[in-house]
């Protein structure tokens, strides 16, 4: 597991991100997530700016398209030097293989290839919704583990999943396979639009490699204090 929780920068503009980051010590190197809202508003410049501030970036765009398109997109994203990026496992093994090839092609000589992970089922998706909307008539965990095995077959580094599925995925894949888990909430906090949530401590105990935390930090009265508490809960054994 990695000791820094990933902070979801779910803000609409770089200006708001800058205001938020001012609440942290300048020397604090963070691991942050840039999702669709922020990336589509600010473009690649937001990633470059965050890296200039000394932060690691998980670029969460969930690519899902034909293999050729995804490969070319990943070649360009690799040039940004992000630490992690992702695709939708539902795009299939060929698409995921193409994504990995694109990342390798786009990574600068001597630089580390970004970790590539696949989204299995969104943590906002309930089993009932999966059955009704996606016509996937197996238990939700079975679907998630199937997608994880497809991602492993494609040569990906891991998956995005609920911590509730992490142990099953680890039993079905190689030991180094990553389980990055959103839907993390400290004890007693609101779950919002998430369906399958756990605490940082529980995520650690059941096998998460990385955790992503958004509103419990970004909307806290004291974000740095909230971050430190979550980091402690996540990293202490």
Swiss-Prot record:
It catalyses: orotidine 5'-phosphate + H(+) = UMP + CO2. Transmembrane segments: none annotated. Pathway: Pyrimidine metabolism; UMP biosynthesis via de novo pathway; UMP from orotate: step 2/2. The gene is pyrF. Keywords: Decarboxylase, Lyase, Pyrimidine biosynthesis. GO terms for cellular component: cytosol. GO terms for biological process: 'de novo' pyrimidine nucleobase biosynthetic process; 'de novo' UMP biosynthetic process. Catalyzes the decarboxylation of orotidine 5'-monophosphate (OMP) to uridine 5'-monophosphate (UMP). This is Orotidine 5'-phosphate decarboxylase. The active site is at 62 (proton donor). It is an enzyme of class 4 (lyase). Its EC number is 4.1.1.23. Belongs to the OMP decarboxylase family. Type 1 subfamily. PROSITE patterns: OMPDECASE. Homodimer. It comes from the Bacteria. Substrate binds at residues 10, 33, 60-69, 123, 185, 194, 214-215. It holds the Pfam family OMPdecase. One of its GO terms (molecular function) is orotidine-5'-phosphate decarboxylase activity.
């Amino acid at each position: 597991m990695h000791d820094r929780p990933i902070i979801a920068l779910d803000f609409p503009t770089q200006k708001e991100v800058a205001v938020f980051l001012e609440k942290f010590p300048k020397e604090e190197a963070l691991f942050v997530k840039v999702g669709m809202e922020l990336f589509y508003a600010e473009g690649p410049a937001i990633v470059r700016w965050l890296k200039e501030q000394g932060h690691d970036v998980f670029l969460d765009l969930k690519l899902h398209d034909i293999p050729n398109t995804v490969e070319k997109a990943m070649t360009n994203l690799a040039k940004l030097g992000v630490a992690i990026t992702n695709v939708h496992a539902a795009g299939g093994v060929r698409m995921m293989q193409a994504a990995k090839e694109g990342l390798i092609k786009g990574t600068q000589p001597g630089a580390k290839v970004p970790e590539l992970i696949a989204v299995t089922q969104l943590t906002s998706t309930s089993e009932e919704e999966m059955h009704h909307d996606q016509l996937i008539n197996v238990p939700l965990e079975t679907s998630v583990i199937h997608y994880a095995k497809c991602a492993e077959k494609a040569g990906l580094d891991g998956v995005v999943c609920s911590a509730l599925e992490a142990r099953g995925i680890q039993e079905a894949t190689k030991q180094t396979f990553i389980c990055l888990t959103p839907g993390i909430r400290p004890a007693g906090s609101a779950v919002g639009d998430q369906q399958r949530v756990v605490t940082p401590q529980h995520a650690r105990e059941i096998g998460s490699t990385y955790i992503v935390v958004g509103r419990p930090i970004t909307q806290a009265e004291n974000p740095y204090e909230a971050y430190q508490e979550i980091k402690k809960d996540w990293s202490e054994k």
